[in-house]
Swiss-Prot record:
Source species of the chain: Homo sapiens
Positions annotated as zinc finger (C2HC LYAR-type): 1-26, 28-52
Cross-link (Glycyl lysine isopeptide (Lys-Gly) (interchain with G-Cter in SUMO2)): 14, 207
InterPro entries: LYAR, Znf-ACC, Znf_C2H2_LYAR, Znf_C2H2_sf
Name the UniProt record assigns to this protein: Cell growth-regulating nucleolar protein
Domain notes: The N-terminal zinc-finger domains are required for the appropriate production of 28S rRNA and the formation of pre-60S particles.
Induction context: Induced by MYCN. Induced by interferon-beta.
Length: 379
C-alpha cells in the first residue's frame, strides 16, 4: 500500500483516501510519496501504484532487490486494468469501477476471489455488474496469448537444421539426444522419482544375482553329502578327495555319543541327589515312639509296628506323655503326622486327607475332649 503526504497541510493519506482529502483540504495541489519522496501534481498519483521497499530504501546504492513472481503478475494485471479503461465500448459504470480498482495493488486474479474482493472493498453487490467486469478481464486475458503466439511465429519458413543432421547421425545417438531433451523438460520431482526407481531396480538385480550365485554354490555341496551317505551305506570307503568330509561326520558322531553319555551321568547324579534328599527328610520327620510307663507293661493303645497306622493309639500315647494329659491341637497334629510318615514310609496320603482324618478322630472319639485350642484325654 502506497502512502502520500499532503504538501498543504502535511497529513499522511492512503492512496484510496486521497479523493476524500482533496474535498476537505482545498489547498491540496501536490502530493509526495512517503517512501520514495517523489512529488505528484494533480491526478498523477493514480499511476504511482507501487513504491520501493524498505530494503531498497536503506540498502545503499549497489543494492538490487529480488523480484517476486507474484509482484510481476500483479503489475501486469494492473496494467491490463488501465488498458481496459481506455476502451471505447466500456459502459460508464464499469469504467468508474475500473478506475477504483486501478488504485489498489492487491487485485485478485481469479473469478470467485475477485468478486468477493469487489463486494468487500468496493461495496458492489450487483451480480450483473460483477459479471460484466469479469467478462472484460477474461476477454483481455484470452486475447493476449493469441497475440503473443502470432508475434513469436517466424515470417518466412526456415529449414529445420535438426532434420538434416538426423539423416547423417545414427539412430542410437538420436535416441540419446531425444532422451536428454525430455529430461531437461521434466521437473525436479520427476527426475528425483526416476532416480529412486533406477536405484531400486539396481538393488533388485544385485539381490537376484547374489541369490543365484548362492544357490549354485550350495547345490554341489548337497550332492557331495549325498554321495558320502550312499558310500557309507554300501560299506565302501570314501575316496581321498572327500576324506575331510568323512572326518567331519565322524567327529560329529563322536560328539553326539559323548553328549549322550554326559546326559546319562547327569541324570544318574540327579536321581542320587533326590534319593538322598528324601532320606534326610524322612529322618527329620521320624520321631521316637512313646516310651512305656515306668514299672508297667506296654499298653495295647500305643503305636503299632510299621504297616497300618493306628490313629487312636498314637493320639492316646502322645496325650499320656503330655503334662496333665493335655496338649495343643497344633503340637498334637505335628507329632501324629510325623509318626504317620515314619510308619507308612512312601505309601502315604496327601496332607489334606490326613488333616480331615485327624480332625474326625479327635472330634468323634469320646475319650478326647476339645477345649478351645487344646485336646485333653478323658480317663
Amino acid at each position: 500500500m502506497v502512502f502520500f503526504t499532503c504538501n498543504a497541510c502535511g497529513e499522511s493519506v492512503k492512496k484510496i483516501q486521497v479523493e476524500k482529502h482533496v474535498s476537505v483540504c482545498r489547498n491540496c495541489e501536490c502530493l509526495s510519496c512517503i517512501d520514495c519522496g517523489k512529488d505528484f501534481w494533480g491526478d498523477d498519483y493514480k499511476n504511482h501504484v507501487k513504491c520501493i521497499s524498505e530494503d531498497q530504501k536503506y540498502g545503499g546504492k549497489g543494492y538490487e532487490g529480488k523480484t517476486h513472481k507474484g509482484d510481476i503478475k500483479q503489475q501486469a494485471w494492473i496494467q491490463k486494468i488501465s488498458e481496459l479503461i481506455k476502451r471505447p465500448n466500456v459502459s460508464p459504470k464499469v469504467r468508474e469501477l475500473l478506475e477504483q480498482i486501478s488504485a489498489f495493488d492487491n487485485v485478485p486474479r481469479k473469478k470467485a476471489k475477485f468478486q468477493n474482493w469487489m463486494k468487500n472493498s468496493l461495496k458492489v453487490h450487483n451480480e450483473s455488474i460483477l459479471d460484466q467486469v469479469w467478462n472484460i478481464f477474461s476477454e483481455a486475458s484470452n486475447s493476449e496469448p493469441v497475440n503473443k503466439e502470432q508475434d513469436q511465429r517466424p515470417l518466412h519458413p526456415v529449414a529445420n537444421p535438426h532434420a538434416e543432421i538426423s539423416t547423417k547421425v545414427p539412430a542410437s545417438k538420436v535416441k540419446d539426444a531425444v532422451e536428454q531433451q525430455g529430461e531437461v523438460k521434466k521437473n525436479k520431482r520427476e527426475r528425483k522419482e526416476e532416480r529412486q526407481k533406477k536405484r531400486k531396480r539396481e538393488k533388485k538385480e544385485l539381490k537376484l544375482e547374489n541369490h543365484q550365485e548362492n544357490s549354485r554354490n550350495q547345490k554341489p555341496k548337497k550332492r557331495k553329502k549325498g554321495q558320502e551317505a550312499d558310500l557309507e551305506a554300501g560299506g565302501e570307503e570314501v575316496p581321498e578327495a572327500n576324506g575331510s568330509a568323512g572326518k567331519r561326520s565322524k567327529k560329529k558322531k563322536q560328539r553326539k555319543d559323548s553328549a549322550s553319555e554326559e546326559e546319562a551321568r547327569v541324570g544318574a547324579g540327579k536321581r542320587k541327589r533326590r534319593h538322598s534328599e528324601v532320606e534326610t527328610d524322612s529322618k527329620k520327620k521320624k520321631m521316637k515312639l512313646p516310651e512305656h510307663p515306668e514299672g508297667g507293661e506296654p499298653e495295647d493303645d500305643e503305636a503299632p509296628a510299621k504297616g497300618k497306622f493306628n490313629w487312636k493309639g498314637t493320639i492316646k500315647a502322645i496325650l499320656k506323655q503330655a503334662p496333665d494329659n493335655e496338649i495343643t491341637i497344633k503340637k498334637l497334629r505335628k507329632k501324629v503326622l510325623a509318626q504317620y510318615y515314619t510308619v507308612t514310609d512312601e505309601h502315604h496320603r496327601s496332607e489334606e486327607e490326613l488333616l480331615v482324618i485327624f480332625n474326625k478322630k479327635i472330634s468323634k472319639n469320646p475319650t478326647f475332649k476339645l477345649l478351645k485350642d487344646k485336646v485333653k484325654l478323658v480317663k
